[in-house]
Regions:
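Extracellular beta-strand-rich solenoid/capping regions of secreted or surface-exposed proteins
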Residues: 71-98, 134-138
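Structural boundary/hinge residues at secondary-structure and domain interfaces
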Residues: 77, 139, 172-174, 179-185, ...
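Charged, low-complexity interaction regions
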Residues: 133-137, 291, 396-397
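Cleaved targeting-peptide boundary
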Residues: 51-61
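Beta-strand-rich solenoid/repeat architectures in extracellular/passenger domains
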Residues: 59-78, 96-129, 145-168, 173, ...
Length: 828
């Protein structure tokens, strides 16, 4: 153990300290040097000595700037690190920063500050970081940042310093816990949280041109709140300690009524990593070693434009050439991962939750990409909440649970009179996604170490209140909403004299996904695989059971159950939806249960039991209400497709030994209802383009595990899932299809097939052998199918080429084949 001294642990110094105590925090532009403001640095940061831990700011933490011409404004602050003393091990928080400026900014070619290495920099740049903790001490939080800008900010090639990545940058980082904790039997210190960020912009933000630099991106406003890494526990071998919890990202709020122009139609920004209009990232950091839980992502709120009805106020225009991603508005809340356990008394660290987001635009957004296609998700509005993955387990412990995605639900809204338009392949209109983190895997080579559960997910809601969404490109969705449960972790494989291996973790449950489109709204896509509205609620798949190899007997791990899908529903209350392109549906809503995990394989000399397959997850209702007009023109471009599909059961694991029993295949689950109510006009123009297609489909049962040995029993197959109600109600309106095999209405309820029984192979040398093949299990039944025309004014017409006005089917799947005993293998 260290003695209590007053020395500080060294931490890196920023080169900002080189400016000394008199820092020109608001730098006059070259075009007007008659107005300037000198702001003295406060605290000790400006005069820090080499190798000394320090605190303070370079540039005043509070600045008020009038109507002058400037080049740059900045403030960077650090909290003091803890010291190696029992009462002073905690890091201090970073200072809060407030900038209120009415200046007009034209950036200078020479950057008057040196950026912290973990900042994107900006014409207005703020940075605050908490101090590091010592031993088990808690790291300091990043300070809060408030920026209010009233003036224009302009950046051109001639004034580009070549390094900054935004016009307005706000960064708050929590300090990190101690990675070298030598206080005996102590837990790791928690990482500091990122501070809250509030940015209000009234000024025009313009990047007219830039020097190409693929090592950076460019954003109009870029706000990042990030937690610090949790500190390491002293030792996983002695006592029962935990790694420090990772710091959470802070909340972020951006309000913008200034125009944001990045590039132009004649001069797009070229060769950048990314081009984003308004960007907010709240990111938790990892827990410390061992088994530290991750830090959560914070809530994000972005309000763009004014509710006064002028959609040009706060308009965002993005012109990008060959960037990895292009986004008008971008929100990302990431829960971090838990760390692996090396301590047999504790599970792997839990993954943390992603935060909720709320995005609202009253102003137009245009994103145009040229050159090579984006490598990352791009669109007019892109919002993502991601749970962190769980850490791996160790001997007789379980992998950490995956974090939840958007645990409290998230919304995106496009207001009346607003147009969100994109041009380019793989550039969507409005995207809202939430995903649970993956459960941690069990440790291989360790006894009975199971996978962790996947994270659950909250609801996603997308609203279009009289606005327009327009996309032009391949796989350029109009609206895309998804809630996806996390995958269960895999069970650890093991080799031992006797015992069992770990089971797979359960998949996480999905949240509901909804869309509401009002009268006056328009959603238009041009290009193949570009559905106007796509909504997915998908349960996470179960993890795979671990394999087991032994001498005296043992069993493999069971597969984890799949997570449940939730409701996927849209109310098109008078909106106009049109697509032009193959497989570009008008509306696609899907609820899908996660598949069960595969059982593990058991191999040995005596009694062996194959792992059972996991059960499939259930599916929720897939529901469409339509009173608007839907038009498609392309091959297999259905007007409305509603599907509820339950997860299939996992296949069972095989067994090999003198006495061997294959695992039982997992049962599939129930599908939900697939329901469509329409009183609007639906028209399709392509071949195989059905007007309305509603399907409720049960998943298939998992196959039973095979067995190999002298006395063998194959595993039974799992039962198929049931289809439930598939219904279409026409309350007036019309359906017209013109292509071949383009039915007006098709409704189906189909049960899933039962799983095959496991086969057996009897291997004997000079002795009789006994083998029993596994039994098959029955398939699921189909449910009710109902098509109703409640209004005699309704009409359904089809073109030539064997289409039917109405096609309905309900079918139960048959049982799968029971396995036969294979011929003996051996010699008398």
């Amino acid at each position: 153990m260290k003695h209590a001294t007053r020395t500080r642990k060294a931490r890196p110094r920023s080169s900002l300290a080189a400016f000394g105590p008199g820092v020109q925090a608001a730098f006059p532009s070259e075009r007007n040097t008659s107005h300037f403001l000198i702001v003295l640095a406060v605290g000790l940061g400006g005069a820090a000595l080499a190798g000394e831990a320090y605190a303070g700011c370079n540039g005043n933490a509070t600045q008020t700037i009038g109507q002058v011409d400037y080049g740059y404004t900045w403030s960077a602050c650090w909290g003091d690190s803890g010291v190696d003393d029992k009462d002073e091990k905690n890091g201090d928080p970073g200072a809060s920063i407030t900038i209120n400026t009415q200046a007009s900014y034209t950036a200078g070619a020479s950057l008057p500050y040196t950026m912290p290495w973990d900042s994107v920099g900006g014409v207005i740049m703020t940075y605050t970081m908490g101090g590091a903790g010592v031993d088990e001490g808690t790291a300091g939080a990043g300070g809060a940042v408030t920026i209010t800008n009233y003036g224009p900010i302009t950046l051109t090639t001639s004034t580009d310093p070549g390094s900054i990545g935004s016009l307005i940058s706000a960064t708050s980082f929590g300090g990190s816990g101690d990675g070298d904790n030598d206080n005996y039997k102590s837990n790791g210190g928690a990482g500091g949280s990122g501070g809250s960020l509030t940015i209000t912009n009234y000024g025009a933000l313009s990047v007219e041109s830039l020097s190409p630099n693929t090592a950076r991106g460019m954003a109009g406003i870029h706000a990042v709140s990030k937690g610090g890494t949790g500190g390491n526990q002293n030792s996983g071998a002695a006592g029962d300690q935990f790694g420090g919890v990772g710091g959470s990202g802070g909340s972020i709020s951006i309000t913008n009524t200034g125009q944001v122009n990045l590039g132009s139609a004649t001069n797009p920004l070229n060769g950048l990593d990314y081009v984003w209009g308004l960007a907010a990232e709240s990111i938790g950091q990892a827990g410390g070693h061992d088994n530290g839980a991750g830090g959560a992502g914070g809530a994000i709120q972005i309000h763009n434009g004014s509710s006064g009805g002028n959609a040009s106020i706060g308009a965002i225009n993005i012109y990008s050439n060959s960037a990895d991603s292009a986004r008008g508005i971008y929100a990302f809340s990431q829960g971090s991962y838990g760390t692996a356990s090396q301590d047999s008394s504790d599970d792997g660290g839990a993954g943390a939750d992603g935060g909720q987001f709320s995005i609202d635009t009253y102003s137009d957004i245009a994103v145009v990409t040229t050159g090579s296609d984006p490598n990352e998700l791009s669109g007019g509005i892109v919002a993502i909440s991601q749970g962190g993955d769980g850490g791996a387990g160790t001997a007789s412990t379980t992998g950490g649970r995956g974090g939840n995605g958007s645990a409290f639900g998230s919304t995106l809204s496009v207001q009346s009179g607003v147009t969100v338009s994109t041009k380019g392949d793989y550039v969507a209109g409005v995207v809202g996604l939430a995903q649970g983190g993956r459960g941690g895997d069990g440790a291989s080579g360790e006894k009975d170490s199971s996978g962790g559960r996947g994270g659950d997910v909250g609801a996603i809601q997308i609203n279009v209140y009289g606005g327009s969404i327009e996309t032009d490109g391949i796989q350029a969705y109009g609206l895309l909403g998804g809630s996806i449960g996390g995958q269960g972790g895999n069970g650890g494989d093991d080799t031992a004299v006797v015992g069992t291996s770990g089971g797979g973790g359960f998949g996480g449950n999905a949240g509901g996904v909804g869309a509401y489109v009002t009268t006056g709204s328009k959603i238009t896509t041009t290009g193949d695989f570009s559905a106007a509205v796509t909504l997915h609620s998908i349960g996470g798949g179960g993890g795979t059971g671990g394999d087991f190899t032994d001498v005296l007997g043992g069993g493999a791990g069971n597969g984890g159950n799949g997570g449940n899908g939730n409701t996927a529903t849209i109310n098109n209350a008078g909106g106009t939806i049109s697509t032009s392109g193959g497989h570009s549906y008008g509306i696609l809503v899907q609820s899908i249960g996660g598949s069960g995990g595969t059982g593990g394989i058991a191999e040995g000399l005596t009694l062996e039991l194959g792992g059972d397959g996991g059960e499939g997850g259930s599916a929720g209702a897939a529901s469409v209400q339509n009173t608007g007009a839907i038009t498609t023109d392309g091959y297999s471009a259905h007007g409305i497709l509603a599907q509820s599909i339950s997860g299939g059961g996992g296949a069972a694991g095989t067994a090999g030994g003198i006495l061997s029993i294959g695992g039982t295949g997992g049962n599939a689950n129930y599908a939900g209802n697939a329901e469509v109510q329409s009183s609007g006009a639906i028209s399709t123009g392509g071949d195989a383009a059905i007007g309305i297609l509603a399907q409720s489909i049960g998943g298939g049962g998992g196959s039973g595990g095979g067995a190999k040995g002298i006395a063998t029993v194959g595993g039974s197959g799992g039962a198929g899932g049931y289809g439930t109600y598939a219904s279409v109600w026409l309350n007036g309106g019309s359906i017209a299809t013109r292509g071949e095999m383009a039915h007006g209405i098709m409704a189906q309820s189909i049960g899933g097939g039962g799983g095959n029984g496991g086969s057996v192979i009897d291997m004997s040398v000079g002795i009789p052998a006994l083998g029993v093949g596994g039994s098959a299990t029955g398939g699921g039944s189909g449910g009710w199918v109902c098509v109703t025309n409640e209004n005699s004014g309704g009409d359904c017409s089809t073109g030539s080429g064997a289409p039917q006005a109405v096609a309905i089917a309900t079918a139960g799947a048959g049982a799968a084949r029971a396995a036969d005993r294979d011929a003996d293998v051996g010699a008398d």
